[in-house]
Amino acid sequence: MSLTAMSLSIVSQNKVFSGLLTKYSFLSSVLGGLEAKMNVFVPKEASASNKVPVLYYLSGLTCTEDNAAQKGHLFEAASQKQIAIVFPDTSPRGANIPGENDSWDFGTGAGFYVNATREPWSKHYNMYAVSYTHLRAH
């Protein structure tokens, strides 16, 4: 399923330097129907007729879609260079798999960019598909 086939909901929008930062939520089929979130920064010069490069910023351990957007200090340079930035959450949230939150460095918030191959993880833990295929398709 592509992003264009998904229902994106705008959670918030903020003007940042000469662009717009929008937080979206959507139901992700590759995460087993869980809600996923991402922040997208678009410089003001970007449009359908003026495409700009896109940087996908994959945050690390214990991060959400907000960490780099709030702390990365990237928007001034992205505005100047006319670069869009996508900040996806790098973990599925709400899978409620027994034991997934027993350790801070495994499970929710761990930020592994792989697809799980074993049950019960394989239904929801497909962050490679989300980060490298699902979001980049559009």
Predicted segments with their positions:
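Short substrate-entry loop that stabilizes the transition state in hydrolases
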Residues: 48, 52, 59-88, 93
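Secondary-structure boundary elements
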Residues: 47-48, 132
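Conserved small/polar residues in nucleotide/adenosyl-binding loops
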Residues: 133-138
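Short, conserved beta-strand segments within well-ordered enzyme catalytic domains
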Residues: 25, 39-41, 56-57, 85-87
